Amino acid sequence: MTARDIVESYGRAIPPDGKPEYFRLHRYRFRALLAALPPAPARVLEIGTTPGQFTAILRRASYAVAGVDLFPEQRADLWRSLGVEVRFCNLDEQPLPYTDAQFDAVVFSEVIEHLSGSPLPALQEMARVLRPGGRLVLTTPNQLYIKSRLRTLADILLGRPFEPFDEFTRSMRLHGPQRYYNHSRLYTMRELRWLIEQSGLEVGLARYGDAWEQVGIEAGRLLRHPLRVAAKAGLWLLTSAFPAWRSMLLIVGQKPE
């Protein structure tokens, strides 16, 4: 089965209480991640497992999976049902709770932008637990995503704050692990390349992904939301012509043999 087949087979099996809307929003990211991994049954460490959909996809694809998360207890029943041990770890403050060279791959998807400190120590930890030849597969929102840039330009022209006041007050009240709910900063591809190299890995694949542009332009939504689909399709065509404006960065770092 292809990465697409595996992801879509999982999507068809999601029960109503299994966050189907989350899957709809993230399915294209899941496909890109799965396609970038070494073949199963490689041993994979997933960093930031909640809500567990990609964890389940990895198991469906026959990978041996371990995970770390800030709140492993919140989905403990799911981890047991999948046969996956998920340990607590705060990457800003702690080393990964594993010995050297344990994993064939590390998945670090949509997490780096939430770290409050420099991500370099965490990336060096990921390099440490990889076996020689192992891969770090990382995705994060693109700082140069054209939709975000246009929104910022509109805010400037209209004299609006970049962050609505109610969002500001919510952010200011976050404390402890809750502070990681927000994005601390976004990255460019050049910055990610530098971070990967400084962590001791070699950059393999480095690609601008359109995971978010594809959401909402599925054929089944055209009759229900024609104007919205047309607008999103236009954005997708624009970023297809200018890949550096796409929504997602995907980079693979490989540990030297």
Q: Where is each model-derived feature located?
A:
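A structural alpha-helix within SAM-dependent methyltransferase catalytic domains
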Residues: 34, 59, 123-127
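Conserved class I S-adenosyl-L-methionine
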Residues: 41-50
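A short SAM/SAH-binding and catalytic strip from SAM-dependent methyltransferases
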Residues: 107-117
